[in-house]
Structure formats: structure tokens, C-alpha cells
């Protein structure tokens, strides 16, 4: 999710209970195709779901049928402004929708890795040297906070 709420908290360094203090520049976005992921999870006998808000909250709703993806507030997911005066609580909640797979996620399902900068992209390229599966690494600066 571009400019996620959690990324903002990491960027600002003000999330109680989170020991990571490295800011947003070292965070990568792992991109996968949802239908392919669901097919893999079903075949592996693993549960998957997507939520309509933050899965860490005590009141989230989840779905496990791709036909229900239309219930995700996609405008909220894409929103650049998700808090503050005049912004609906539905936007902040919807911005935190998540797709989850239990236990594990296989490397071969990744189709892309979004990074903050060219330098970070080069670092990720070095880390993936020698791997048979190479997701596309792309600088996606607009997915990060200014």
C-alpha cells in the first residue's frame, strides 16, 4: 500500500512498542499478485484473508472470498491524506486494509520490490544476486512519505 499508516509511524519514529528506529528509507514494499497467491495458499492448505481495516485492531472485518474485494475501500487505500481535519475516519480505517497469508509466503510469488531510492534498489539487487527468481526492483518514491 503506498504511504501506509504503519510506514508513516516508522518514518516519524513514534510508535510505542516498536523497536525499529530506522525510518522509512530501509523499508521495502513486496508486491504479489493476489489471485496467484490465493491459488498457491489454497493448494498448500493455508488460510488467507483480507481485511477491510487494520487487522491488529479489535474490531476489524475480514473476508476470504476474492469476490468480496469490492468491499475494500480502494479510494482509502490509495489516499495520500488519511488523517487530520476533514478526513473521514473511514479513510484512515480503510487505508489500513491488509492481505494476509498464514505461516509463510513463498519468494517465487513476489512479482516486484518497491524501494525508496536507487541506492536502496542497488542494495536489494546485491542481496538477490544468485537467486533464481528475481522480482522486478523499482524505485517507487511516491509510495513513501516526503
Stretches with model-predicted labels:
Residues 2-146:
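Active-site-proximal loop/hinge segments that shape catalytic or ion-binding/gating pockets
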